[in-house]
Amino acid sequence: FKSTPLLSEMPIGSYVDYTATGGSIGSKKVTCSSGNSSCTGIIANSSNDGTYGYCKDEKYKYTTKGYRIAYMKQNDSSEKQAFLVSASSLECINNIENADTKAIKYCNLNYVDGDCSCQDNDNNGVCDSASSDVWSINDNDFYAITKEISGVGRKLTNFSSKLDAVNCDNTFSSKECGYNNDILDNGGYYYFNAKSNNNSIYWDPAVRSINTKESGSLGLRPVIKMSSNVVVTGGDGTINSPYTISNNDIIINDD
């Protein structure tokens, strides 16, 4: 057995003790300060009453917190990598126009293969395209998460991407589309970084499915692509005892 198991060997949905530190937008450094609770996965609008915060409507509070393993993929070297997602929303945003830019600060150089950066060729403080290390949850992530749930990936809507998959538009109480799976169905409102006929796509906790046309202050959920070398050093993967992690270049196998 492995004395230090890989994070990519852990179950989907496991909680991970991850702290964001920041990255860079072009040459500009952005940080997730130690005093900002969102860096450790504490939800927007959290309070001291034991609830997990909300965006848009206090009636729909998130049911979970921290960071979780959302799905796995193989890299070009055929090594599995774990993709983390914030368990709920780390901040509330008014639109998705700069969602990938806002996600940059939730990176951590210790756990990714890249440099936690995005290009900003015109130096306007906005990512020209998403970083390869961290981004706002999008249609490709939805496909990967729903594939982990049912074995068959789904896309958000017919118009949100060119993915060859059944879409989840106007589909309710469908486990294949995330219903009752708290990686997606997490109690609160949040945006997907995708559009359908120029309409925003979001998770609607009132119907527990995706919806479109909403505007206003909904949640941002960063996705982080972890290095294949990240190992588990402790914890049991639950919300109260998340896996603690380290990035080791060499994994020692015990016979």
Which residues are covered by each model-predicted region?
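Collagenous Gly-X-Y triple-helix signature in extracellular proteins
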Residues: 1-255
